[in-house]
Amino acid sequence: MSNISSQSNDQDESRLNVLIIDDNEQITKMISSFLDMIDHECTVVNEGKEGLELIKTNQYDSIVLDLAMPEVDGYEILDTIKNEDPSQLRKIIILTASNVSIESIRKFKELGVASCLQKPVDIDQLLSKIQDTTG
């Protein structure tokens, strides 16, 4: 009986809680479907303001963040986190549809962001980056 309980606890410990903040519904569906398939918990929001509130009130293992969103964009979210809880920055994987300069990537790294990936995102690469944020 204790083996079953132990296995369940191991599964719970390996299950990641991921927040996806992106206004592109096609991308969020693809990422969340994949994460659900491999038994990770996934919260999806399409607005930066809502995502920022969730970051402030919940604990996530990893945060996938789009930079270009209407109203509250990824840059504003990064700035708020930097000022309010910089330890959260190491959990963030930035997604961007535009070409990101080497200088911007360097600035993200200096800020403490885990990674920056360009869309269309390679799901295996994203999963690897998500797992890196928890290690």
Where are these regions (language model features)?
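Active-site residues of response regulator receiver
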Residues: 66
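Two-component/phosphorelay signaling modules centered on CheY-like receiver
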Residues: 25-43, 111
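Short amphipathic alpha-helix used as the core "switch/output" element in two-component signaling
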Residues: 53, 75-88
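Receiver (REC) domain active-site loop signature in two-component systems and cognate sites
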Residues: 69
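Alpha4 helix (beta4-alpha4-beta5 surface) of REC/receiver domains from two-component response regulators
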Residues: 76, 99-115
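Helix N-cap/capping motif at the beta->alpha junctions
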Residues: 44-53, 74
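Non-catalytic signal-transmission and effector/linker regions of two-component phosphorelay proteins
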Residues: 1-17, 124-135
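Hydrophobic/aromatic residues positioned on beta-strands within the core alpha/beta folds
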Residues: 95-96
